[in-house]
Curated annotation (Swiss-Prot):
GO biological process, one term: double-strand break repair via nonhomologous end joining
Function: With LigD forms a non-homologous end joining (NHEJ) DNA repair enzyme, which repairs dsDNA breaks with reduced fidelity. Binds linear dsDNA with 5'- and 3'- overhangs but not closed circular dsDNA nor ssDNA. Recruits and stimulates the ligase activity of LigD.
HAMAP family: Prokaryotic_Ku
Descriptive protein name: Non-homologous end joining protein Ku
NCBIfam families for this protein: Ku_bact
Positions with biased composition (Basic residues): 271-292
Amino acid sequence: MAPRAYWKGSLKLSLVTCPVVLYPASTSVEKTRFHLINRETGNRLKQQMIDAETGDLVEGDQKGRGYELSKGQYVEIEPEELEAVQIESNHTIDIDSFVPREEIDQRYLNHPYYIAPDGKAAVDAFAVIRDAMKDQDRVALARIVLTHREHVIAIEPMGKGMLGTTLRFPYELRDEAEFFDDIKAPKITKDMVELAGHILQTKAAHFKPSEFKDQYETALKALVKRKASGKPIKLPEPEERSGNVVSLMDALKQSLGKGDKKAAPAPSRRAPAHRRPAKKAHRSAARQRKAG
């Protein structure tokens, strides 16, 4: 059975238009989920809305949406007023520009979607746009309306299809200066940096997501299985922290001595999903945030 499309519409480049479909590239179906239950009965609990001041139960027709102007002061927004500012989808992905891949700052990347042609008649136009981007190593920046909100989406070739990733707006990112300005000047030597470089070489590898292991998820499933079968659960003893103080140079030397993995050759080509933050674009965005 074909996966259900999240969005259907057209991809538009100037006068070239082709029908496309979007599918979410991520899923949380396999994640272990817990529900709140009554310990005495084992029944699932349901949540109710309670007035924070009076403690009274609030029914569905009494609930509204309010924006907090000041502490405890809200302006209520009616549903029809919200609808007035929502953007109706025109079911078109309008490509505004094509940018070099390396200029895209990773911090702006948000939700990924797979983009495929919708029907046989769309394949040729879809392939022309896809292959042109591949040849020039550029990423399309376009606009799309999802759930009544307009988003900027970055579109790039991926195999036979394309990958679209919605981008955050500058106001959604915090300025790194808030966190980095107080970092003091380091007292390190060239030898320390070279030793660290050798350690890096012993751990050099290729990017292989298939080797990622979610140890917490695995442990959760094992815990649930043991608990459901009535087996006792043994809690681990807390680890004692070592009180030994080791100098940075000694730690580097000891780490290098433990390195038993040979350095892997550097990848000949950067993977499409892995992008280096663009300093130029980032500085520009930071200036915009400060100016705002």
